Amino acid sequence: MECSPTERILALFDLMRDWFDSKNFYGCVFINAVAEHEKSNGWIQEVANSHREKITAKLQAMVAASGAQDPEMVTEKLNLLIDGTIVTAMVTANSEIAHIGKLAAGDILRNAQ
């Protein structure tokens, strides 16, 4: 079954919920590494930023394919939402936050048309 770009973006939050429910969920290794080390430790931020750039490029391609008016801004909003969803799930140990994130992502995508 073929999914629309919007459905693919929203499905990311379903995947996150599965990840949050797994016994091996400890948050994002990149967020954790940057948070736990000195800001002067540039190589950790370089690795994290490299990962983020790759993920952002893939997400922005999906956002552009969804017909969003400003794919770059919409992608930044979604990145912020994804990061917040991951951190909140880690802090609260509540995988339901992924559903709330999915609803918010739907709002962002609808408003971007």
Please tell me what each predicted stretch does.
Residues 1-22, 65, 75-78:
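Hydrophobic alpha-helical connector segments
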Residues 2, 20-24, 41, 89, ...:
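A general structural signal marking secondary-structure boundaries and capping sites
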Residues 3, 7-10, 40-65, 103:
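Amphipathic alpha-helical packing segments from all-alpha helical-bundle domains
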Residues 13-16, 30-34, 78, 82-85:
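Short alpha-helical scaffolding segments that buttress acidic/His motifs in well-ordered protein cores
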Residues 22-40:
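Amphipathic alpha-helical segments used for helix-helix packing
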Residues 44-51, 64-112:
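Hydrophobic/aromatic-rich alpha-helical bundle segments in the mid-to-C-terminal region
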